[in-house]
Design a protein with these regions (language model features):
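Sec-dependent N-terminal signal peptides of Gram-negative exported proteins
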Residues: 1-11
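Alpha/propeptide regions of enzymes that mature by internal proteolysis
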Residues: 11-386
């Protein structure tokens, strides 16, 4: 598979990144299934109707770090919350912070308003401002009255630190890269691993990055879908678990050459009609899925979760002074909790399973998780289905 910056869009001097995905497999393809609920068609956040994902990968240069020039191992990932009018029909939203070492732009307004009025973007720590500015410009291009005759737009941007592999002083994610990710956002299968915002990320001392998964409830429980997308850059090797198996302890002798404490951003989507309080409760269950993979939210980790419901959209302008919006009973919400925890756990492991080895600045290397050893261990513990 050939990946280019912007996946062949908006790539100025960036060179193609040749990667062989033939040896990488998602967790279910290895015979390991998390929980009892079935995934959606794509086992991705895009199984929630209307949700789209776009990536831009910025990957160029090699060798020693030249500050401000490269090598670049970074990118941007965007999530479109629905396929309609994202400005005028806000999705109900909430957030939860497990450990706040870092930041996520826009969370204050999400907590205050209970909604999201545009895309969600993920990128590297130093470029939250750059990506936010690009998102504002993109939204203005779609809605020219923003900030003039209409309200101003508050972008939502999450970050993780990719400086162990990336020239973090180079600010390599440009406006055209953000625009390309936004314009190229699509439904269907989602690229995972070292792609987009996940290009320079490491997780449990293996190559990490973008991962996704979904769960579909039974018709008796409403038939709703929960989808999760993560950018994982967290954890120590010995903490790592897959379906309860202490994989990290068994693989400690295969340490990667780069170790740096990092973070994780988790995005939870559902089509169940939830109010903001209920979405926040889903976000808290995503933290349980994170914990199942071994994370204890280390002091130096920033663990940020944002969630939204496409099934309860809030009109920006309405002639009605009282709105009647659908809302799921709390008595029916427990299956969504299980779906969220399971999908989060699997999304994180999918990121590890799908990521290739990446050599970054100064030869720093983040090594791909050895899938043959993982399968061997999971079979030993009786966790494989085949």
């Amino acid at each position: 598979m050939t990946l280019t910056s912007a996946d062949a869009q908006g790539a100025d001097a960036d060179q193609p990144v040749e990667t062989d995905k033939s040896t990488r497999r998602r967790l279910r393809d290895l015979g390991v299934e998390i929980g009892s609920l079935a995934p959606g068609k794509f086992n991705a956040i895009t199984d929630v109707p209307g949700v789209k994902v776009g990536h831009t990968t910025v990957f160029h240069g090699e060798g020693d770090l030249v500050r401000g020039e490269g090598p670049a191992r970074t990118g941007v990932t965007v999530i479109m919350p629905h396929s309609g009018d994202i400005w005028r029909d806000k999705v109900t939203a909430a957030s939860f912070v497990v450990n706040g070492n870092g930041g996520m732009l826009g969370l204050d307004w999400i907590r205050e308003s209970g909604g999201i009025e545009g895309p969600i973007a993920l990128t590297n720590t130093h470029q939250v401002g750059d990506v936010a500015s690009a998102m504002v410009r993109w939204m203005i291009s779609k809605y020219p009255d923003i900030g003039v005759d209409d309200e101003t737009y508050v972008p939502v941007v999450g970050e993780c630190d990719d400086s162990a592999l990336n020239d973090a002083q180079g600010f390599h994610v440009k406006q055209q890269h953000v625009f390309a990710a936004l314009d190229g956002a699509a439904s269907g299968a989602v690229a995972e691993g070292a792609v987009g915002a996940g290009t320079g990320m490491s997780c449990y001392d293996w190559k990490g990055g973008i991962g996704t998964s979904s769960r579909v409830l039974s018709e008796d429980d409403g038939g709703y879908t929960v989808g999760v997308l993560v950018n994982c850059n967290h954890g120590d090797r010995d903490q790592m678990r897959i379906d309860g198996v202490p994989v990290g302890v068994h693989l400690e002798q295969d340490m990667a050459t780069v170790h740096r404490e990092g973070s994780i951003v988790i995005v939870v989507a559902t089509d169940a009609p939830l109010n903001a309080r209920q979405v926040e409760r889903l976000c808290k269950r995503a933290a349980m899925g994170l914990a199942r993979t071994g994370s204890v939210a280390n002091t130096s980790s920033g663990d940020f979760i944002v969630g939204f419901s496409t099934g309860r959209q809030i009109p920006r302008a309405s002639e009605d002074t009282v709105l009647s919006l659908p809302e799921l009973s709390d008595n029916a919400i427990d299956p969504l909790y299980a779906a969220t925890a399971d999908a989060t756990e699997e999304a994180i492991i999918n990121a590890l399973c799908m990521a290739d080895t990446v050599v970054g600045r100064d030869g720093n290397t983040s090594t791909a998780l050895p899938l043959d050893r993982v399968v061997e261990l999971m079979r030993t513990y009786g966790r494989t289905k085949n």
